[in-house]
Amino acid sequence: MEIRVIDQEEKFCDLKENWGTIINNMKVKSPFQTWDWNYNWWYLVENRECELLILEAFEGKDVFGFAPLVIKNKSIEFIGDKHFDYGAFICAERKREIIQLFFKHVCDLAKKRSLDIVLKCLPEKGDQLGIIREIIEDIPHSLVRKQVDTANLNLEEYQNFEGYLKAISSSLRKKAIKPCLKADIEFQIEMYNDDLWNDIADIYDDRQSDRIGVSTLEWARPIVKTLNQAGLLNISTLKYEGNRVSFLIFFEFSGNDYIWLTAFKKIGKFQLGHYVRYCLIERAYKKNVVVVDMMRGAYDYKKQWDCNVSSNYEVIVFSSWWKKMKYTSYQKGRKFIRNF
């Protein structure tokens, strides 16, 4: 098996069919492995800030896998920056052989150009993380570190929506859901338009005013517009007294829903963050969705939804011993401060 490097847009476009075929055969996958996500994120968001590095594993005329990578900030990393939730190589068979080839190539390139290899959000589900652990055992200055918890709700564990509601806390039902139901707050799925986006940005800005490190959603506008029009990304909103007061943007992929971006305004005592999730879960039952994945952050409010919790890991190969020591010291200090 050999490796071919793809570093130009037109060649990236040519990969769509083979990429999709492999994705369809993968047992553990997410929307962040699709060609649509990777191409559009790179093209619309990252392409001026990074160097494209798609690796294609092939044998003769047959293509067996892809590594969706970029070189950015002196690191080799997955496409998606900090805004994707599950990282993985694109391969369905001969995975160990393919991932070993990918690692050999990126390690050689990293050594030649003094780059770090930083692969984030590798899920513990499936076998890719285990394969990568074995591969990097003999690679100097490497580490595998638990990065973040994820939360997901398997709807097949309950007989129906009513049965699921009995599993969540009575406090959540009484304080968060019932008041919103009585207030006749409207949940709807909408298609992208500029007026809708302006309301989404306003809701997000309103929420950010309560937080440290204020940000905006301007980075998300082009990718949300494109993927919504492509049918991969849905936009849901809550309306109260004719005004949009909450939004929840989610991927619909391979029988599962993946919550990606959400925010809400402060309206009286309504707990709109909870209610918009309630509405999405109710819709999921009607649409025969199998899993509602709340993705990063197994916070208490997500556990209230009777979610299953798993973990994502980061794999880093540092260009020097000193950089590894500096990073591990920083993480230990950060954890100490958080616990304190």
Where are each of the predicted segments found?
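Short catalytic-loop micro-motif centered on adjacent basic/acidic residues
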Residues: I117-K120, Q188, V291-D293
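Short amphipathic alpha-helical segments
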Residues: M1, D85-G87, I185
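A gly/proline- and charged-residue-enriched helix-loop-helix capping module
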Residues: K82-S114
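ATP-hydrolysis module of ASCE/P-loop NTPase motor domains
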Residues: K111-D127
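A conserved beta-strand-loop-helix scaffold within acyl/acetyltransferase catalytic domains
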Residues: I3-G60, F64-I76, L122-T150, E156-G268
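Active-site/acyl-donor-binding loops of N-acyltransferases
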Residues: V5, L129-E162, Y240, K287-F340
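Aromatic (often tryptophan-rich) hydrophobic motifs at membrane interfaces
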Residues: F58, E97-D108, D206-T328
